[in-house]
Amino acid sequence: MEKKEYRNRIRVILAEKMITNTYLAEQLGVSKMTISRWCTNTTQPSAPQLIEISRVLQCDLKDLYEAIEYYA
């Protein structure tokens, strides 16, 4: 059975745009640890936070996530 899992691409976009975790944390008013957890997909940002992330990173919301398909 094929399944999909969604992972955020925040780390990838930060690297592409040469933006630091510290800068993103300051812009969003969250800790650097929170950004680190998002970048490793340990936790996920809320919907309002995703909107703010897309604004700060100047990217579309759809670019913040990717689907990973696998068989279970």
Where are these regions (language model features)?
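Short, charged recognition helix plus adjacent turn
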Residues: V12, M18, Y65-A72
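Recognition helix of helix-turn-helix/homeodomain-like DNA-binding domains
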Residues: V30-Q44
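Key DNA-contact positions within bacterial/archaeal DNA-binding proteins
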Residues: T22, M33, K62
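DNA major-groove recognition helix of helix-turn-helix
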Residues: C39, Q49, I68
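A short, Lys/Arg-rich alpha-helix, primarily the initiator
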Residues: M1-I19
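DNA major-groove recognition helix of helix-turn-helix/homeodomain DNA-binding modules
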Residues: P48-D63
